[in-house]
Amino acid sequence: MAQSKPAYKVADIKLADFGRKEIILAENEMPGLMAMRSKYGPSQPLKGARIAGCLHMTIQTAVLIETLTALGAEVQWSSCNIFSTQDHAAAAIAQTGVPVYAWKGETDEEYEWCIEQTIVFKDGQPLNMILDDGGDLTNLVHAKYPQYLAGIRGLSEETTTGVHNLAKMLAKGDLKVPAINVNDSVTKSKFDNLYGIRESLPDGIKRATDVMLAGKVAVVAGYGDVGKGSAASLKAFGSRVIVTEIDPINALQAAMEGYEVTTLEEAAPKANIIVTTTGCKDIVTGKHFELLPNDAIVCNVGHFDCEIDVKWLNTNATKKDTIKPQVDRYTLKNGRHVILLAEGRLVNLGCATGHPSFVMSNSFTNQVLAQVELWTKFGTPQEYKLGLYVLPKTLDEEVAYLHLAQLGVKLTKLSDEQASYLGVPVAGPYKPDHYRY
């Protein structure tokens, strides 16, 4: 593979200059990652690491990649979604010599090919670290390249869906490398998942359709962190939001925020917009499509494309019109139309540019710290054994701290007496691990 593969494969390398300009802008909005370069760059803690990354190849990810290389790592990259690559970002990184295999609009076969190119490096040596988003790279290495598992020091996983995958693998005895669950760092799940989607969801819907959100009935399937951000965003735009949930605790939270909570079967006949956020499959199926009013918009912000039954639409619709890339209008047998965005994949990345740089700096700083933890602790008494871990609270607080100055935040300082009264160190950590923010 190492001898025959191309040095990179992107849509158009001539987009690199445009990509570089946007990367420079993003760096100004990503103080956590820039602080990682300043703090760790001189000591090169990732020297010797060969990181295979599978995560949306965006401008923000470009800043992450260049932070990893600044810390000494060799990196190869693919995207974790066929529509999420920003081609100018991929070109800019490829131009620096980092092997990137990603372009917007990959086929499923091309998608797997791209991931496979990141397994073995140009010198013939295989990966020894994994940075994943959703679990596709992790699953591929375990299933198809088990001979490399013994040499992998660890992996870090970005998203809820990927963490669920790791937990299942661990329970079955299938996970063979230690893993850090980046998603459940407070500075990831309570920021990226909540505040990130709050801005990127309406961006995706509006770029795709130019729809007026005010006054529309919007159904949000799922009220986890992503669902909470989605519902809050749509409500802020003036939509009348209905939530569907399986969990009584989340359902009660939604009700206490003033949302109507009911089943999708009851909500569908009046739903102008449906957003799935569950991480589960078969959320919007044929029976729901047939209940929708004319020209209802259906989209997803869960990681995979199994939440919306796109296959049913392609099989049962009498006509499919592609309005523009990632915007398809289906004519149903009942004469009504359904507008599907991003083919049921992530609408905020398929139809827009994903979360803003600042909130992604939170998430990606956690990724850098996770990679440093796994790589540098290997072979020491603090080595991460086989298992699924979260980053220590001290690092979670550090990530938050690195982003305060840019927002003009001034922290109150505990006195020694106050710290003693609370039973916490003056410099933190301030909350127990079980605290729910």
From Swiss-Prot:
Pathway: Amino-acid biosynthesis; L-homocysteine biosynthesis; L-homocysteine from S-adenosyl-L-homocysteine: step 1/1
Any GO MF annotation of the entry: adenosylhomocysteinase activity
Record carries keyword NAD: yes
GO terms (BP aspect): one-carbon metabolic process; S-adenosylhomocysteine catabolic process; S-adenosylmethionine cycle
Cofactor: binding comment: Binds 1 NAD(+) per subunit.
Residues holding NAD(+): 159-161, 193, 224-229, 245, 301-303, 348
Keywords: Hydrolase, NAD, One-carbon metabolism
PROSITE patterns with a match to the protein in the record: ADOHCYASE_1 (PS00738), ADOHCYASE_2 (PS00739)
Keyword Membrane: no
Binding site for substrate: 58, 133, 158, 188, 192
Range of residues in the leader sequence: none
UniProt-listed Enzyme Commission number(s): 3.13.2.1
Reactions accelerated catalytically: S-adenosyl-L-homocysteine + H2O = L-homocysteine + adenosine
GO cellular component: cytosol
Alphabetized InterPro entries for the sequence: Adenosylhomocyst_ase-like_sf, Adenosylhomocysteinase-like, Ado_hCys_hydrolase_NAD-bd, NAD(P)-bd_dom_sf, S-Ado-L-homoCys_hydrolase_CS
Family annotation (PANTHER family): ADENOSYLHOMOCYSTEINASE
Subunit field text: Homotetramer.
Family: Belongs to the adenosylhomocysteinase family.
Physiological role: Adenosylhomocysteine is a competitive inhibitor of S-adenosyl-L-methionine-dependent methyl transferase reactions; therefore adenosylhomocysteinase may play a key role in the control of methylations via regulation of the intracellular concentration of adenosylhomocysteine.
NCBIfam families given in the database record: ahcY, PRK05476.2-3
Protein name, UniProt field: Adenosylhomocysteinase
UniProt source species: Caenorhabditis elegans
